Regions:
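Trp/Tyr-centric glycan-recognition "aromatic platform" motifs on solvent-exposed beta-strand/loop surfaces
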Residues: 100-102
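Oxyanion-binding/catalytic loops of NTP- or PPi-dependent enzymes
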Residues: 1-98, 107-114, 119, 126-649
Length: 649
């Protein structure tokens, strides 16, 4: 049986593309109108009517804003509690459902964001089938590198709803590097991929060596992109319109009313703002015409590139911290890079290109693209080259097509090694996180450890899966919990193997197995980090800021656990050997025990971790005092074993 061709898809916030490899050449497939970019826009004309997708939907967005969905990628795989800021960017009703998921209400029906994305994917599927001339059922779909597990799963679901078997979920910057790397397979080079799209930003650092693409690190923000620039321009124009005597469109609460007269006006302003932003990448000033914005009001404004840059400079600057973190994770400096690749339509903006050139101390460009200031201090003759040779809108889709070809058996001299951006582990006794897969581990990856019980007669073990960079479980994010049952046994006897596996799509599977009975549970983690990217970055920052405090906490918790075990063993020995030790020795043991018990109790009562060094010293003293007791207990245990075997009477 001949397998169908695998296509590569860039499912974007504003535009989506489908690509394939034909006769060894990756290319983007055009639709029936000859357009290679398909707007990620879906219009629902009536409750029972088929949705309109792409350019046709985009054309009616201004007229029917409450029934036309765009930028659905911003909501995919997210909880309703996270959407308050983003819902101000759209003109259709978005809300959090009772289950916590985000839904979009059109004509009285609630749609999940993945259902909207599925309609876009169906359109791409039809376009690909028309071009190839055969059914297309397999796809590689790209996502932002910093998408969490829930967002990746939702993207995969969207592909399946569209009729695809999703062969692989690939990070967008990694796919772009594949597209740029085709003609340099034998070079060894380090590349930074600066990917600023309409809804997301990623900075990935990769090493290309003899056809192997190894992702060294990735960092980003899935809530930062060109949409934020559009909103800033819209807010600016709204104030200008109000000052010119036009309608007051500053009441954001009206946006939530699908029947509001503001929606068509705001939709027109948003479209005009987006077009002006695009034109200002090649022009220094543009007219923003809004004729008959209201029945008796028309408006025109001449927007300059300088005004645009002043309005949006702080948004672009927010990408800086992600770039520096990614470089730090890769243990590199800008001078260690060979190239910086620009990906995403927003990187056409001259301000972005100047910002990137300055941040990475790029060497001079051969062409004045982006109006890079030549001979400025931040340009180094031996710095990395700012590579703009690929179409930034198409690079990701082309890379996805190349990955699809690799999976099909083509391009055998290429290999893609991606990474996971955050550490994964489980909670252990005492409330600590035990890391099983560290952050920036190359995926796919599989790792595991063996754990045991800390309580006598325990009949089950709760596996609490965590993600984050802190020492204490409570400071990290909970991905899920499940229980593995086993036979009752003394503490330390059961042995439970826990294995984490991150597949090539970046999706986590957790296996827990009782090594005695082989009883096991396998859980697919469907909801990863249910927080926004500000919280993701807060986690990384706090892991550095609180590193010393976390280390103290871990040292205290581990020492306190050992202290409790030692106390229990010593108390047991005093009971079992009550007739074989004198009163003076018992008093010495009791005093040493009391010292340790008091230190543990004081540490538990305090708001800060106790003094681990002082507790360790007290434990050492207790160990020395109880050594004769331990020897006596060992002798009694050996005698019992010999008597059991009939070797002594």
């Amino acid at each position: 049986m001949v397998m169908s061709r695998i296509v590569g898809i860039d499912l974007g916030t504003t535009n989506s593309l489908v690509a394939t490899v034909d006769s060894g050449i990756p290319l983007v497939i055009a639709d029936a109108e000859g357009q290679r970019l398909t707007p990620s826009v879906v219009h629902f004309p009536a409750p029972a009517a088929d949705p309109v997708v792409g350019h046709a939907a985009n054309r009616v967005r201004v007229l029917k804003p409450a029934e036309t969905v765009y930028s659905a990628k911003r909501f995919i795989g997210r909880r309703g509690s996270e959407i308050s800021q983003e819902e101000m960017l759209v003109t259709y009703p978005v809300k959090g459902a009772a289950t916590g998921a985000v839904t979009i209400d059109i004509h009285g029906r609630e749609y999940a964001p993945e259902e909207i994305s599925a309609e876009v994917l169906k359109k791409l599927k039809r376009d690909a089938e028309a071009f190839i001339g055969e059914p297309v059922t397999r796809a590689v779909i790209t996502v932002p590198a910093y998408f969490n597990d829930a967002q990746r799963n939702a993207t995969k679901t969207a592909g399946e709803l569209a009729g695809f078997t999703v062969e692989r979920i690939v990070n967008e910057p990694t796919a772009a590097a594949l597209a740029y790397g085709l003609d340099r397979l034998r070079e060894r080079s380090r590349i930074a991929v600066y990917d600023l799209g309409c809804g997301t930003f990623d900075l990935s650092v990769l090493e290309l060596n003899d056809g192997v693409f190894h992702v060294l690190s990735t960092n980003g923000n899935t809530r930062l992109g060109g949409d934020d620039l559009d909103k800033r321009i819209v807010d600016f124009l709204v104030e200008k319109i109000k000052a010119a005597g036009g309608p007051d469109l500053t009441d954001k609460s009206e946006i939530r009313n699908p029947k509001s007269e503001m929606l068509p006006m705001l939709s027109r302003i948003r479209e005009a703002a987006e077009q002006a932003k695009i034109k200002l990448s090649t022009e220094t000033a543009v007219e923003v015409p809004l004729p008959f914005l209201a029945s008796t009001f028309s408006f025109t404004y001449r927007l300059t590139r300088q005004e645009l840059e002043d309005l949006t400079r702080d948004i672009i600057a927010r990408t800086r911290v992600h770039c520096l973190r990614s470089l730090a994770d890769a243990k590199l400096e800008p001078k260690d890079l060979d190239q910086v690749i620009l990906v995403g339509g927003q990187t056409r903006m001259p301000l972005v290109r100047r910002f990137v050139a300055e941040l990475f101390a790029c060497a001079e460009l051969e062409e004045p693209s982006g109006e890079i200031r030549r001979d400025s201090d931040y340009h180094k003759p031996k710095g990395p080259r700012l590579n703009t040779s690929q179409n930034p809108d198409e690079a990701v889709a082309l890379g996805a097509a190349i990955q699809a070809e690799i999976l099909s058996g083509g391009f055998k001299n290429m290999l893609l090694l991606d990474v996971t951006p955050l550490s994964l582990g489980i909670e252990t006794f005492g409330g600590l996180m035990n890391v099983i897969i560290p952050r920036n581990s190359t995926i796919p990856v599989k790792a595991g450890e063996v754990f045991t019980t800390a309580v006598d007669n325990q009949r089950s073990m709760l596996i609490h899966v965590l993600q984050g960079e802190r020492e204490r479980a409570s400071d990290n994010w909970s991905l899920g919990r499940f229980t593995l049952d086993f036979e009752s046994a003394p503490k330390g006897t059961p042995r439970v193997g826990v294995q984490f596996e991150i597949d090539a799509n970046g999706i986590l599977h957790v296996l827990a197995r009782d090594l005695k009975t082989a009883k096991q549970k396998v859980v697919k983690i469907k909801s990863a980090v249910d927080v926004d990217d500000a919280e993701v970055q807060k986690m990384v920052d706090e892991s550095v800021e609180h590193a010393f405090e976390d280390l103290r906490a871990r040292q205290w918790i581990e020492t306190a656990l050992r202290a409790r075990q030692t106390i229990a063993a010593a108390r047991k020995g005093l009971v079992e050997c009550v007739g074989e030790i004198d009163a003076d020795y018992r008093t010495k043991v009791e005093q040493a025990l009391k010292t340790v018990e008091n230190l543990v109790a004081d540490g538990e009562a305090a708001t800060q971790p106790g003094d681990a060094a002082k507790l360790k010293a007290a434990l050492t003293a207790l160990d020395e005092v109880t050594q004769p007791l331990a020897d006596l207990m060992m002798d009694k245990a050996m005698e019992a074993q010999l008597r059991k075997r009939g070797l002594v009477k």
